[in-house]
From Swiss-Prot:
One BP annotation, GO: DNA-templated transcription
Catalytic activity: RNA(n) + a ribonucleoside 5'-triphosphate = RNA(n+1) + diphosphate
Protein function: DNA-dependent RNA polymerase catalyzes the transcription of DNA into RNA using the four ribonucleoside triphosphates as substrates.
Protein name: DNA-directed RNA polymerase subunit beta
Subunit field text: In plastids the minimal PEP RNA polymerase catalytic core is composed of four subunits: alpha, beta, beta', and beta''. When a (nuclear-encoded) sigma factor is associated with the core the holoenzyme is formed, which can initiate transcription.
NCBIfam families: PRK00405.1 (NF001616)
EC number, as in UniProt: 2.7.7.6
Organism annotation: Ipomoea purpurea
Pfam families the UniProt entry points to: RNA_pol_Rpb2_2, RNA_pol_Rpb2_3, RNA_pol_Rpb2_6, RNA_pol_Rpb2_7
Localization in the cell: Plastid, Chloroplast
Length: 1067
């Protein structure tokens, strides 16, 4: 990096790797060193662990086997332990197994119970003290100092109009700072000696106050009385002091090492770093600063500045869990020692320690903790972006409903650290974000960003990583790094940042400059070409929608890209990379044999594996037999990658024009070519599973002999009752035949069964059919069947059978497609290719977008990409465009697009590609009539993605199904075969049309009128007219009963239609 100023993009999984390595190297040692010596009550036995000699054993199973058999890919932790009998001076030392720790794989994820999981980083308010000012109801500024502990607990210091200082211990209760300082161990003389304004402290010290702080015990009693809201006069005791320590001091006064560092820096203190608790000296210095603010001295804090935030990385979260597990282990060891002494047994270190606390703690953490999530594996991009997310939610953090707009907003300190674009939409906007490409987590949990230092003394370029707050003291040139590397004129002025302000200064005044055009953005935003021409809201949608793109059966590289595609594919783990030099011996669809350094390696390839979003993960060999390869070369492409580059969509011919209203309001018109030539065809793999239990009537049985089922439905079962691999199955077919034993009541026995029971005493048991069947929309090819048998075979460890079915899905009406600029739409019609508009060279258009979707959304990047893609397809070129190219010259993007179109029109003899009267547009023809359209139309080849929101997963209908027990109304949701809700506004719409009978049907027969819907079923079978309902529906009867529970009686009558007679009827 010296000299040329060149830099490489860091590995996208680096943050996860560094966090896990820090946990293994430092976190384990730190927590083990805190494990105390354990002694029994009589101090006869002493047990201790040795930190220096812990060992992590390499796992016995491979990652692939862990996924296949639903196991945890973990390493066993062994620690040396010593047990000393003090009476006989005997000593035993053993290396003991204390539990398993899930390991991180090469993609930065963990495999727990066969499921890929990832721990995302959490961003929290950093512990320390923060000063802010608010206006009270009289418009007077009120200054407060908030002390945040390492656990997230908060205490506030306030100064009132009379310059009296209070510590707020709860929402309603506050106490004098003198009382709190005295309760923490300071006397009045020490307080006055350690403050800058002793006269102010003396001014609000009354005789009553002097009595309260006369001794530490009095101060503790006063503090306890205020904190616990206790009436009367409590008496000082050790238990009272312990309760106060547990409820207040431990939760709100433990600063931690980061909090101690922040407190020392903010208040100019020199307290040692190992003193991590709040001291009276801290309180008094904080009060001094508060008095200074009252008199116009000192500065307030910006709570949303990144220097006041910290990242809880994977290392911190795993270390916390390890500490929790050791506390549980300590309690278990104490209990075992007491039990052994009581029963006069001689324990060994191995007998004292159990692996359950550590193993179960990590299993529950990965399974239940909000920051441990199932890895999203829709496509390779989704995997790497998931690991770089951060969240403000979770334990100790914010909630989506209480977070303010200021917390969610972009801050100048985010520059180069947090992406200003990539965040979730909806209630969590601004709370869940993505780290910028070059950001890294520093030693103190701060986010650091790299800059190049500009020095007059040396010609070389030095790269610095600066934490938030430090870069504010430098003039940072925000220009494009490639442009700044050129010869700079003496009088050149450049845009720069200084103390959160943007300035234009001379080049000689610049201290630092950014290193990369993508430095400010996340991976998702960095994949958008011409992002500078898009509105930020549309760029946000695009970076989210790229993560929803489905890997296609035949992937294709984008013509117009940004250059980050290769790195994204490389770090995703979708590719197979050569780890050494060598020669390819043999290639097949499922493996590559590779010889190097005198040994032959077999590299297995992923074949039709299911991701957790039901997409298909598949690897294809890219090398031929006998070819010599170098280290780092690509051996096989994965899903959605081509030649080692990310390939999420297809380059298709698009026209921006209205077409008979079929593309209004974000609808998209497509050609049947996309269906018949499998342009947007994708494979999806669904998993169906069933368990066999041991019931009270006996074990469930897997068999192919299922009574009362047509042979057609069980045609694909083998002799064991499990579907054959390779079978084609349709809706309703049995995948696994299973019978569950059940005892039937005697009254329902057949006569011959009763006779057998009476004469021979044979108990006749019948079985219920509980087969696994193909649900609606589940048709496809069975590609894999797994019978997982857990060790032990008890009823608590049931056997599990999993069936995987592959579906081939062409694009169809109702599917969602999107570009890379937030331009999304639903397929509305599939036209025959002869009816689609066609170009002057006879080619028909593939997609028709609505031009009205561009100006109001201000995502003009799609126009540049569209035209440049057309030029690239004609010239057979690929372009990689860095963002913000206008910094080279004015209108740089437009110039490069027009110059390439002009070159394409000349070189390929297609003059229509660039027409000077309307550059970028062309006259095209109506496929139905052959006549040209009145206006020239924008045509091009953008990169269009097919998203995972597919109509096959969403379309749903119900004729009959399950009803809720209380309301007797149909259930809700596609998964429960539920009904469509007719709400209040839908009723108004039907009333407006005057369709009284349809409305009555909706609210009675099709909803919750039990008798009426039974009659409908009968009349449908027999024929005839459907009778009108004679009484109130179930929901009305429910309302009457609920009112009765409130002691309100609703008198209601039913009026006859014929003679208007009133009939009283009990609801």
């Amino acid at each position: 990096m010296e000299g040329g100023g060149m830099t490489t993009i860091p590995g996208f999984n680096q943050i996860q790797f560094e966090g896990f390595c820090r946990f293994i190297d430092q976190g384990l040692t730190e927590e083990l060193s805190k494990f105390p010596k354990i002694e029994d009550i009589d101090q006869e036995i002493e047990f201790q662990l040795f930190v220096e000699t812990y060992q992590l054993v390499e796992p016995l199973i491979k990652e692939r086997d862990a996924v296949y058999d639903s196991l945890t890919y973990s390493s066993e932790l062994y620690v040396s332990a010593r047990l000393i009998w003090k009476t006989s001076r005997d000593m035993q030392e053993q290396t003991i197994f204390i539990g398993s720790i899930p390991l991180m794989n090469s993609q930065g994820t963990s495999i727990v119970n066969g499921i890929y999981r990832i721990v995302i980083n959490q961003i929290l308010q950093s512990p320390g003290i923060y000063y802010r000012s608010e206006l009270d109801h009289n418009g007077i500024s009120v200054y407060t100092g908030t002390i945040i502990s390492d656990w997230g607990g908060r205490s506030e210091l306030e100064i009132d109009r009379k310059a009296r200082i209070w510590a707020r211990v709860s929402r309603k209760q506050k106490i004098s700072i003198l009382v709190l300082s005295s309760a923490m161990g300071s006397n009045l003389r020490e307080i006055l000696e350690n403050v800058c304004y002793p006269e102010i402290f003396l001014s609000f010290l009354s005789d009553k106050e002097k009595k309260k702080i006369g001794s530490k015990e009095n101060a503790i009693l006063e503090f306890y009385q205020q904190f616990a809201c206790v009436d009367g006069d409590p008496i000082f005791s050790e238990s009272l002091w312990k309760e106060l320590q547990k409820k207040f001091f431990q939760q709100r006064c433990e600063l931690g090492r980061i909090g101690r560092r922040n407190m020392n820096r903010r208040l100019n203190l020199d307290i040692p770093q190992n003193n991590t608790f709040l001291l009276p000296r801290d309180l008094l210095a904080a009060a001094d600063h508060l008095i200074g603010l009252k008199f116009g001295m000192g500065t307030l804090d910006d709570m949303n500045h990144l220097q006041n935030k910290r990242i809880r990385s994977v290392a911190d979260l795993l270390q916390d869990q390890f500490g929790l597990a050791l506390v549980r282990l300590e309690n278990a060891v104490r209990g075992t020692i007491c039990g052994a002494i009581r029963h006069k047994l001689i324990p060994t270190p191995q007998n004292l320690v159990t692996s359950t606390p550590l193993t179960t703690t990590y299993e529950s953490f990965f399974g239940l903790h909000p920051l441990s999530q199932v890895l999203d594996r829709t496509n390779p991009l989704t995997q790497i972006v998931h690991g770089r997310k951060f969240s403000s939610l979770g334990p100790g953090g914010l909630t989506g409903r209480t977070a303010s707009f200021r917390i969610r907003d972009i801050h100048p300190s985010h520059y180069g650290r947090i992406c200003p674009i990539d965040t979730s939409e909806g209630i969590n906007v601004g709370l869940i974000g993505s780290l910028a490409i070059h950001a890294r987590i520093g030693h103190w949990g701060s986010l650091e960003s790299p800059f190049y230092e500009i020095s007059e003394r040396s010609t070389g370029v030095r790269m610095l990583y600066l934490s938030p707050g430090r870069d504010e003291y430098y003039m940072v040139a925000a220009g494009n790094s490639l442009a700044l590397n050129q010869d700079i004129q003496e009088d050149q002025v450049v845009p720069a940042r200084y103390r959160q302000e943007f300035l234009t200064i001379a080049w000689e005044q610049v201290h630092l400059r950014s290193i990369f055009p993508f430095q400010y953005f996340s991976i998702g935003a960095s994949l958008i070409p011409f992002i500078e021409h898009n509105d930020a809201n549309r760029a946000l949608m695009s970076s989210n929608m790229q993560r929803q793109a489905v890997p296609l059966s035949r992937s294709e590289k984008c013509i117009v890209g940004t250059g980050v595609e290769r790195q994204a594919a490389l770090d995703s783990g979708a590719l197979v990379i050569a780890e050494r030099e060598g020669r390819v011996v043999y290639t097949d669809t499922d493996k590559i044999l590779f010889s190097g350094d005198g040994e032959t390696l077999s590299i297995p390839l992923v074949m039709y594996k299911r991701s957790n979003k039901n997409t298909c993960m598949h690897q294809k060999p890219q090398v031929q037999r006998g070819k010599c390869i170098k280290k780092g070369q690509i051996l096989a492409d994965g899903a959605a990658t081509v030649e080692g580059e990310l390939a999420l969509g297809k380059n298709v011919l698009v026209a921006y024009m209205p077409w008979e209203g079929y593309n209004s309001e974000d609808a998209v018109l497509i050609s049947e070519r996309l269906v018949y030539e499998d342009i947007y065809t994708s494979f999806h793999i669904k998993k169906y599973e069933i368990q066999t239990h041991v019931t009270s009537q006996g074990p469930e049985k897997v068999t192919n002999e299922i009574p009362h089922l047509e042979a057609h439905f069980i045609r694909n079962l083998d002799k064991n009752g499990i579907v054959k691999q390779g079978s084609w199955v349709e809706t309703g077919d049995v995948l696994v035949g299973k019978l569950t034993p059940q005892v039937v009541k005697e009254s329902s026995y057949a006569p011959e069964d009763r006779l057998l029971r009476a004469i021979l005493g044979i108990q006749v048991s019948t079985s219920k059919e509980t087969c696994l069947k193909v649900p609606i929309g589940g048709r496809g090819r069975v590609i894999d069947v797994r019978w997982i048998q857990k060790k032990g075979g008890s009823s608590y460890n049931p056997e599990m059978i999993r069936v995987y079915i592959l579906q081939k899905r062409e694009i169809k009406v109702g599917d969602k497609v999107a570009g890379r600029h937030g331009n999304k739409g639903i397929i509305s019609k599939i036209l025959p290719r002869q009816d689609m508009p066609y170009l002057q060279d006879g080619r028909s258009v593939d997609l028709v977008f609505n031009p009205l979707g561009v100006p109001s959304r201000m995502n003009l990047g799609q126009i540049f990409e569209c035209s440049l893609g057309l030029a690239g397809s004609l010239l057979d070129r690929h372009y990689r465009i860095a963002p913000f190219d206008e910094r080279y010259e004015q209108e740089a993007s437009r110039k490069v697009v027009f110059s390439e179109l002009y070159e394409a029109s000349k070189q390929t003899a297609n003059p229509w590609a660039f027409e000077p009267e309307y550059p970028g547009k062309s006259r095209i023809f109506d496929g139905r009539t052959g006549n040209p359209f009145e206006q020239p139309v924008l045509i091009g080849k953008p990169y269009i993605l097919k998203l995972i929101h597919q109509v096959d997963d969403k379309i749903h209908g119900r004729s009959s199904g399950h009803y809720a027990l209380v309301t007797q109304q149909p259930l809700r949701g596609r998964a429960k075969q539920g009904g469509q809700r007719v709400g209040e506004m839908e009723v108004w719409a039907l009333e407006g049309f005057g369709v009284a009978h349809i409305l009555q049907e909706m609210l009675t027969y099709k909803s919750d009128h039990i008798r009426a819907r039974q009659e409908v079923l009968g009349t449908t079978i027999v024929g005839g007219t459907i009778p009108n309902p004679k009484d109130a529906p179930e929901s009305f009867r429910l309302l009457v009963r609920e009112l009765r529970s409130l002691a309100l009686e609703l008198n209601h009558f039913l009026v006859s239609e014929k003679n208007f007679q009133i009939h009283r009827k009990e609801a």
